[in-house]
UniProtKB/Swiss-Prot annotation:
It comes from Influenza A virus (strain A/Turkey/Wisconsin/1/1966 H9N2). Keywords: Capsid protein, Helical capsid protein, Host nucleus, Host-virus interaction, Ribonucleoprotein, RNA-binding, Viral nucleoprotein, Viral penetration into host nucleus, Virion, Virus entry into host cell. Coiled coil: none annotated. The lineage of its organism: Viruses, Riboviria, Orthornavirae, Negarnaviricota, Polyploviricotina. HAMAP family: INFV_NCAP (MF_04070). The keyword RNA-binding applies. Pfam families: Flu_NP. One of its GO terms (molecular function) is RNA binding. It is found in: Virion; Host nucleus. This is Nucleoprotein. It comes from the Viruses. InterPro entries: Flu_NP.
Length: 498
């Protein structure tokens, strides 16, 4: 599949394009985010939002969710066939927050999905612009990754909660396409496959008949996506075994969990993209910026530059720390939930703290929360430096994969060591190396044992000044090697519940 010389850049996946050169890619990504911006401006006009209200991230999220819901064909069809009390399948809406007499009030709005689709298409030159929708999904997914923990989901599928760094993109909808698949972590793919296998074990007809044939195709496709994320021959060979299994069952689940654990050290390649809230693109378009003409990239300086001069606000609950709220959104914007805090802090220019120390809850406000006491503050989304986003796991060289901390999946291509607790990880690999995958298992364990925490990843890669848009002078930071930085240590975040 992906390895047969058909690798496309993320931007091509993101824009659904075939092979393009760099300029064409920049233009089509620019067209995509420009369309999001135009749509947002139009929605603000429809809803009569003031400039301040239009810059409120909660309003942006509501508007984004409305357009995603309007284009969710599968769910729309389901809602029409299974009418539930009090849900109009043809309408979509959510909370819009307005400033009235020095207070914030919540207003629930309802719109025809058809109308939302019309506004979206009109903003995107009459096209469906699926790429823009996927982009919004990835932004929501990145926000969830930074906000919630998935301990319960991990435990339910028989995985270890310490594998949280493999769970990027775990809340992405199935319909997020190639761009969505690129940003999913190894753990996310493993979890989707395990759920599928478990259904097959419990439901005899799952793999049978015409439906079963389609299920099987989906299963093999997911296996191939996961295989493409692994960078060592032994891990890939094990994925072939899982994919070719006649009747996937507990043996395959075992193999998948083994592979997920191995990815803590032999890291998979997972793409990272800076996807920003719709209001940010809206602000830029409103100020006369032409994204398509200027070109745009999700993995270079552009998102940093955009955030340098965008002012976005957020509602803040009475006992929340606005600086912490800003950190949460900054991490989401740069897809940095699983990045080493030392690297994030250096790039951001202010200390990024582990989630257990944040005094803030999620960005979205529940419908039963009291608005009387809500305040709003400016989100500080600027950075000191910028760095290129990576799609590799940071293994030091292709075959002999390097050290991986029990909870880092690098976002930025910046030189550092990837400290990890080998004892903690290796403890999970006691015993079981028999069965048909025994030689691969042995090989994988051997590679893991040879990994050294002091090895340097992304050799020679550095961060850049914001004035250095051509990335000519890398500044290679030096980090305190002993002090590893996981965002998830001492975690007390809420669970993600759909």
């Amino acid at each position: 599949m992906a390895s047969q010389g058909t690798k496309r850049s993320y931007e091509q996946m993101e824009t659904g394009g075939e092979r393009q050169n760099a300029t064409e890619i920049r233009a089509s990504v620019g067209r995509m985010v420009g369309g999001i911006g135009r749509f947002y401006i139009q929605m603000c006009t429809e809803l009569k939002l003031s400039d301040y209200e239009g810059r409120l991230i909660q309003n942006s999220i509501t508007i984004e969710r409305m357009v995603l819901s309007a284009f969710d064909e599968r769910r729309n069809k389901y809602l029409e066939e299974h009418p539930s009390a009090g849900k109009d399948p043809k309408k979509t809406g959510g909370p819009i927050y307005r400033r009235r007499d020095g207070k914030w009030i919540r207003e629930l709005i309802l719109y025809d999905k058809e109308e939302i689709r019309r506004i979206w298409r009109q903003a995107n030159n009459g096209e469906d612009a699926t790429a823009g929708l996927t982009h919004l999904m990835i932004w929501h997914s990145n926000l969830n990754d930074a906000t919630y923990q998935r301990t319960r989901a991990l435990v339910r599928t028989g995985m270890d909660p310490r594998m949280c760094s493999l769970m990027q993109g775990s809340t992405l909808p199935r319909r997020s396409g190639a761009a969505g698949a690129a940003v999913k972590g190894v753990g996310t793919m493993v979890m989707e496959l395990i759920r599928m296998i478990k259904r097959g074990i419990n439901d005899r007809n799952f793999w049978r008949g015409e439906n079963g044939r389609l299920t099987r195709i989906a299963y093999e496709r997911m296996c191939n996506i996961l295989k493409g994320k692994f960078q060592t021959a032994a891990q890939r060979a094990m994925m072939d075994q899982v994919r070719e299994s006649r009747n996937p069952g507990n043996a395959e689940i075992e193999d998948l969990i083994f592979l997920a654990r191995s990815a803590l050290i032999l890291r998979g390649s997972v793409a990272h993209k800076s996807c920003l809230p719709a209001c940010v693109y809206g602000l830029a378009v409103a100020s006369g910026y032409d994204f398509e003409r200027e070109g745009y990239s999700l993995v270079g300086i552009d998102p940093f530059r955009l955030l340098q001069n965008s002012q976005v606000f957020s509602l803040v609950r009475p006992n929340e720390n606005p600086a912490h709220k800003s950190q949460l959104v900054w991490m989401a914007c740069h897809s940095a939930a699983f990045e080493d805090l030392r690297v994030s802090s250096f790039i951001r220019g202010t200390r990024v703290v582990p989630r257990g120390q944040l005094s803030t809850r999620g960005v979205q406000i529940a419908s039963n929360e009291n608005m009387e006491t809500m305040d709003s503050s400016t989100l500080e989304l600027r950075s000191r430096y910028w760095a290129i986003r990576t799609r590799s796991g940071g293994n030091t060289n292709q075959q002999r994969a390097s050290a991986g901390q029990i909870s880092v999946q690098p976002t930025f291509s910046v030189q550092r060591n990837l400290p990890f607790e080998r004892a903690t990880i290796m403890a999970a690999f006691t015993g079981n190396t028999e069965g048909r995958t025994s030689d691969m298992r042995t090989e994988i364990i051997r590679m893991m044992e040879n990994a050294r925490p002091e090895d340097v990843s992304f050799q020679g890669r550095g961060v850049f000044e914001l004035s250095d848009e051509k990335a000519t002078n890398p500044i290679v930071p030096s980090f305190d090697m002993s002090n590893e930085g996981s965002y998830f240590f001492g975690d007390n975040a809420e669970e993600y519940d759909n």
